Amino acid sequence: MTQAAASAGSELSTPPPAGRRPVLVLLLGALTALAPLSIDMYLPALPRMSADLSTGAVQAQLTLTACVVGLAAGQAVAGPLSDRLGRRRPLLAGLAAYAVASLLCVAAPTVETLIALRLVQGAAGAAGIVIARAIVRDLYDGAAAARFFSVLMLVNGLAPILAPVLGGQLLRIVPWPGVFAVLTAIGVALFLGSLLGLAETLPPGRRETGGPRATAAACRALVRDRAFTGYGLAIGLSFAAMFTYISGSPFVLQDIYGMSPQGFSIAFGVNSLGIVAAGQAGALLAGRVALTRLLAAGLAVVAAGGAVLLAAVLAGWGLHGVLPGLFLVAAGQGLVGPNATALALEGRPPRVAGTASALLGVAQFALGGAAAPLAGVAGPGTAVPMAVTIAALAVLAAAVAAAVAGAPKAVAPR
């Protein structure tokens, strides 16, 4: 263990007793699931929403992009705030705002209004995602953190399995705004669960007290840290490949390959099972296999999926080639996310865990939001842009991670 890691480890809060750990896992897993819930439950409704609001595929995809941009921007605010104010207050404020924004989405009269509200919804929900990661870092480090992140992947992974299935079934009985009514209820439930079941993990004596200048200094130190930036970019590029699939596949699979909304939701759920399975394999291997090797394996799976997808689209293999490629792209995320996050946060003191978590989230969702519209640039009749974008991003993620493997870590200044 490095001196930095040892120093950071001495600042860890006491983990909850074994009997309370399942409650912590469920709450934090549900909080990190706000992103897939906000995005994936809505996916089967995209073509119908596009028709109802008389808008094109690119504008419809912007309702996804706006949510992702909000998720990135909100993390940049909520993470540093949680370093100064503690974890609970910013978390509860964000969840309350998320519920209100989701309710307003139900009555959005135009696609422009919906885009704006989705931006707010994403920014509010970001508090849950960034603070959940910071709480894990408050309590765990290194392989222990990687194992906990992988366990969260099990809970988090259920969201992309269930969300599109629930969304597809909802569309059988309600119009597309009904999806946002369900998201409103989820926001209220998470607010109450966090209020009653989540203790403060960053006591006043361990908080950042230097104000905005200290936060800016911590950001500069982290960005200049080759290991942190490299692993953060690897997470961001890999997620961008995944989000290109998320935003492009409703149109590609339903409009080009003729899948029904229900068939699409089932295929999406199967791919999400791959994320869960890979994440649990990573949890079993963490501590016995180096985290860098687990990350490399995940990135290799994502890159292989991108290659299969591109070949299938260019060669005209149809769903028999497209679906396996998308499955590999998704499954690899189960190894990439937990291990890259643990490597990036390893040895960082809890007083900057929120800021570090925010920077990782900004990279992840900003790159994802930028990549998403590329899937539809050539119009609704071709899957080539989606396949090319996914393959290129997967290769870039693997190259960045390989370049920083073994790089020394620095600690943000006081």
Residue ranges of predicted features:
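Paired small-residue
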Residues: 97, 101-104, 112-121, 320-328
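Helix-breaking motifs and short loop linkers at transmembrane-helix boundaries and internal kinks
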Residues: 52-54, 86, 107-113, 124, ...
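A late C-terminal transmembrane helix in Major Facilitator Superfamily
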Residues: 343-382, 390
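Juxtamembrane intracellular "pre-TM" segments in multi-pass secondary transporters
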Residues: 10-18, 201-232
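Cytoplasmic helix-loop-helix junction between adjacent transmembrane helices
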Residues: 117-158
